[in-house]
Every structure is written in C-alpha cells, then in structure tokens.
Regions:
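Conserved hydrophobic residue
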Residues: 32-33, 130, 159
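Short, basic, alpha-helical segments at the C-terminal edge of helix-turn-helix-like DNA-binding modules
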Residues: 67-73
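Hydrophobic alpha-helical connector segments
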Residues: 77-113, 167-168
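Helix-loop "lid/cap" segments that line or gate small-molecule binding pockets
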Residues: 86-87, 102-109, 116-125, 205-209
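Amphipathic alpha-helical packing segments from all-alpha helical-bundle domains
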Residues: 95, 106-121, 128-155
Length: 211
C-alpha cells in the first residue's frame, strides 16, 4: 500500500512540475495579462482539468513560478539557507552572509526572474493583485526570515543592531541596486552581477555597521 501511495505521489509531483514548467514558459513569452489558462494548459501539454486540480487560477501559478525562481529555487535554496544559519560568532556570520549575498545576487540577476519582474511592472496597472502576489511571495518572506536571523544574533550578543528591520534593509539594499541598475533597467542585455570580491566588500561594510 505504501509503495502504491508513493508512486501516486511521485506521479502527482511530476505532473505538477510539468504544469509549472509550462506556466513559466508561457508567462515568460506572453507576460501575465496575455497568458490564459488555456495557453498554459497547452504549453504544459495537460488538460485544463488537470491544471485546475493543482492550481485554482493563473495568479496562484504565477506565485509558484516566482517562488521556484527565487526563494525556493532548488539550486540556490536561498530561504532554507537563511533559516538554517546558526553562526557562532562574527567570523562565521561574515562567511555565511557572503554565501547568502552570492546566492541572492545569482537569483535576482537571473534573466528569467528579471523578465518576470518586467511583466509585473507592465501588468500591475491592469492587475493590481500582481504587486501583492510578488511582495508576499518573494521579498516579504525573505525579509522576515533575515530579520529573524538578525534578532537571534542580537539576542546572543553577536551583533549590535537596535533596529533589526533597518539592519535587514541595509543588507539587501546594495544587492537590489545591482538588480535594478545592472539588470532590470537593461532589457536586451545580459545582466551584470557584481564580482565575488565586490560582494565581499559589501558584506565587510555591512559587518562594520552591525558589529
């Protein structure tokens, strides 16, 4: 019985991944507004009934595509890496933040992610919920997890951050400037992420601010 249940679960997971991959291709090609559930089903090579068995609508699909590209990306595992951080001192914290910043930059400079950001900007005036989908799916979750890390480090006496929210914004701010100036606002060009040594310099400046 357990084997059968496992096989069914594996097939369901594979089918969901198939739907998600089709949705990603459709959204990247047509944007959010112009993509219908019919188009997504056709791209994923599934019936609409199958699509709706996993997702009630294209908003939920779009959110899942964003999640998979960013904080739940199986290659970078950005969210999980922050949740699992338990540095024992400033040296370990610096090392962990360099790794994290590198992952965040890699994720936010991904061409597909930048293309979806442009879609959100272009379509939000017609679909105001897109902005909220993005906020709640990506930045707010990542922000909250990092803020919790700063609070833990402060409570242990590892860092001196009276305002954990400000410390969180201070960490992500420089990274976002690369996303905007060297990625999002250069359509048609390859994104230019900062060099590894530049990321280390950013983290070193950050460490001086919180130590």
């Amino acid at each position: 019985m357990g084997l059968v249940s496992g096989e069914v679960g594996s097939r369901a997971w594979a089918k969901r991944e198939q739907v998600l991959a089709g949705a990603r291709r459709a959204f990247l090609r047509e944007g959010f507004a112009a993509t219908s559930t019919d188009a997504i089903a056709a791209e994923a090579k599934v019936s609409k009934r199958t699509l709706y068995s996993y997702y009630p609508g294209k908003e939920e699909l779009f959110a899942d595509v964003l999640r998979r590209l960013t904080i739940e990306n199986p290659q970078t595992q950005v969210l999980a890496s922050v949740e699992e951080m338990e540095p024992m001192g400033l040296a370990e914290l610096r090392e962990a933040l360099v790794v994290l910043a590198t992952k965040v930059v890699s994720t936010m400079m991904d061409p597909d992610y930048l293309a979806l950001l442009r879609t959100i900007i272009a379509d939000t005036h017609r679909f105001p919920q897109l902005g909220e989908i993005y906020r709640s799916t990506v930045p707010e979750r990542g922000f909250r997890v990092f803020l919790n890390l700063m609070e833990r480090m402060r409570d242990r006496g590892t860092v001196d951050v009276p305002d954990a929210e400000a410390a969180t914004r201070l960490f992500f701010g420089p990274i976002v400037t690369y996303t905007l100036l060297d990625g999002l606002f250069k359509p048609g060009e390859q994104p230019h992420p900062p060099a590894p040594e530049k990321i280390e310099h950013i983290v070193d400046l950050y460490m001086k601010a919180i130590a």
